Amino acid sequence: MESAAQGRLLKPAPARSEWSKSQMGRFFERIEAEKGAHFETYRDAWQWSVDNLEDFWGEVWRETDIIAHAPYERVLASTQMPGAQWFPGALINWGEHLVRGLRSQGSKPMLIARSQTREDFSLSGDEAVDLVTRIQQGLIRAGVKQGDRVVGYLPNIPETIALFIAVTSLGAVFCSVPPEMGTRSVLDRIEQLEPSLIVALDGYSWGAKEISRVNELAAIREAIPGITAILLPYANRDAEVPAGVTAWADFTAEAGEYQVVPVPFATPLVVLFSSGTTGKPKAIVHGHGGLLVTHMRDLKLMFDIDERDRTFWFSTTGWMVWTLSVSTLMTGASMILMDGDPNWPAMDGEWSQWAMLGNNDATYFATGSAYLAASAHAGIEPGKKWDLSKVREIQCSGSPLAADVAVWVYDQVNADLHLCPASGGTDICSGFLSGASLAGVHAGEMEVPMLGVALDSWSPEGSTVPIGEPGELVCTKPLPSMPLFFWGDNDGERYKASYFDVYPGIWRHGDWLIHTERDTWIISGRSDATLNRGGVRLGTAEFYGVLDPLAGLADSMVLHFEDPAGGMGQLVLLAVAKAGADADALEKTIKTTIRTELSPRHVPDFIVWTPSVPRTATGKRLEIPLKRVVQFTREGKVIDPSVMDRGVLVHPDDVDGVIAAVIAVLP
């Protein structure tokens, strides 16, 4: 794999004369004509969007043809954070816009389902709407009312998407928990909500593994008395339906007309959950209007998706990316849905994400940066094995994308595509930073703040840090998709403490952000996971940037245990060796690489060999939870299981051994 300098230009920004080729370009050409503004670059357009926040979001509403059952009084009635008031007076419904998108495509395949558990199939736009109406009839018979919470304990399949649309169109609140989560992880989330109904599957396959969820459903019903349960026979079409549970076929037996309940802009739509690193997962409530206008901006303007696209978002149903992916249907684009292990039977096998793209004529691909890095470091050449010429854009997130991996994408996937490393969060169910059709692509960097995002990098004193220095990622003006509230946080104190405790009235996200001299951006790690060695701050991304490419190293994680007296502390590197690698030789290579490419200060005090490191299914390293568990264990404290939610981990059985190995080396 070719090495690459940070910031190397991989694709230039389009000429001003080419702006009309994208939805974003045409949007700003209209703004120029109607408002007398002038834009030469994306930076100009972004600056206008944050300087004229009400105008911008009002124009997004107009451009994307939001269906309003009552008009809004003004765009932004209060700019206070938290508590900004967006589009007061408007009556809308998120689900109605997805149904409009589905109906507009009629007989075109819109939900193209690929599964390791059952046979493949597709639903046309009309068929998907029919399923939505059948689910609505079942919900109504079950007594689900506006404001009730409905849970989907389901994978990324058409039924889950139809359930999401049906529930929210009726004004009820949806919550998704992925089937890889066990009973405790599910209950830690949904018990907070007191849901009235759950739709669950009987089981599923993950590669060669067959996993039952029958006992989990029974335990959930026992823990939440009175909940209505629906069983979807997924692993076994003839699965026995327990007493007191309704079969999916009976639940969806009656067809009906599509029903929509218009609701105020700030009405709860969906509950997403934090990763649970500081107690039970935060139940983050997002509203109909916030996700509607934000996802319209994302999908149409930032990602340039329209009815000609066939999109593939690889995501578990527990990740915010899945919620964003479902909104794709608003654009008339179709979705390729995959449920299964993308590394089975091999990283470049028939179930790989690359195979999903090539075999299904995908044009837009959203995945984890970790997946791209793993493919690159494994020497995979997807562009040679599959026809990926139709892939016009790759969006990647979850962790920083290294410069050499970005170069690999252009060399081995498609030289003409647009690569868009992005960063956002469950907290806003969208992004702060991304690529854009009007911007270029630089290796190892994120191109631009998203439109309408007043992004900055701040010092502890609350001022913009100099170019090239890390600061706290802040958002200085409100966004429509900031959470309405946290469920159960009646006084709002937990919400305020999560984002507004450092800079009152200013959103602090918790990432270290660097603004480069190229006007691009780098996230160097979580600010609460930063390593402070003798007063020098080190971002974890700096380590992974030099370690991930090492030939014999399969994975790694860096932990720093501070010295209360202000000394250097203990720096521990968890390392996973590839099969056949010489651990002693690899340890020397690791230390030499870190010493020469970073600095002697970065060299770990201990290298601990482990079978895996704690990662979520989306590839996110869980440094902070692991560090807390180690600290609590050493101090003899009782550890709440929610400190590290094993239900979200790829290798939960390895965790106890990893914890013990770290404790063993610490003095």
Language-model segment annotations:
Residues 1-19, 208-209, 222-223, 240-244, ...:
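AMP-binding adenylation
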Residues 31-38, 97-124, 235-243:
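AMP-dependent adenylate-forming
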Residues 43-48, 95, 111-165, 182-187, ...:
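Conserved AMP-binding/adenylate-forming core of the ANL superfamily
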Residues 107-109, 231, 242-273, 280, ...:
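Conserved pre-ATP/AMP-binding loop-to-beta segment of ANL
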Residues 155, 197-216, 236, 339-343, ...:
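Adenylate-forming
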Residues 165, 169-250, 360, 368-369:
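Structural core segment of the AMP-binding/adenylate-forming
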Residues 292-310, 320-363, 378:
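Conserved AMP-binding/adenylation subdomain of ANL enzymes
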Residues 301, 392-520, 527-530:
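Conserved AMP-binding/adenylate-forming
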